[in-house]
A protein has these predicted regions:
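Enzyme catalytic cores with a strong preference for nitrogen-chemistry domains
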Residues: 1-152
Length: 152
């Protein structure tokens, strides 16, 4: 797991990287798998296989999404808290588009926005949907919007 510890970020003050090993937790009387390499498929949509990575994973040289795609993921979801800085929005957009092109998949990027509670950084909520290198939908920065796109 990737934790940022550079520039404005210092996540390692509060968190430590988790184990890459798979495990389970008890929830609602059921064993629920947990881990960094889970893939979710849909019985009703043959080619739909979804994987997730977290924020910093996209920004490192070898993101978990590479292994997810090699294992069959067709959609990668990234849950993020990426702040705003001059030029960062276009760089973030290029990262998402590039990753979707490189992995030949859809890449959904959802970042913190309006209502984020931290006082040290500003979060603009730039949410993106890209497929095979093309950005299909993008929210306006500092607007509370829902993005929708058809992924083929």
């Amino acid at each position: 797991m990737n934790l940022p510890a550079y520039n404005e970020f210092y996540e390692t003050r509060h968190f430590m990287s988790g184990s890459a090993d798979m495990g389970t937790v008890q929830f609602g009387g059921e064993e629920i798998p947990v881990g960094t390499n889970l893939l979710f498929s849909c019985e009703n949509v043959a080619d739909l296989c979804v994987a997730a990575e977290i924020c910093e994973d996209l920004w490192v040289p070898n993101p978990p999404s590479v292994q997810h795609a090699l294992a069959g993921a067709s959609v990668i979801c990234n849950l993020s808290a990426s702040d705003e800085m001059v030029g960062k929005g276009s760089y973030r957009r290029d990262l998402v588009a590039g990753q979707s092109a490189r992995l030949v998949c859809a890449y959904l990027y959802a970042t913190a926005g309006e209502g984020e509670s931290i006082t040290d950084l500003v979060f603009g909520g730039q949410n993106l949907i890209a497929e095979n290198g093309t950005v299909l939908a993008e929210s306006a920065t500092f607007e509370n919007e829902t993005n929708v796109a058809t992924i083929d």
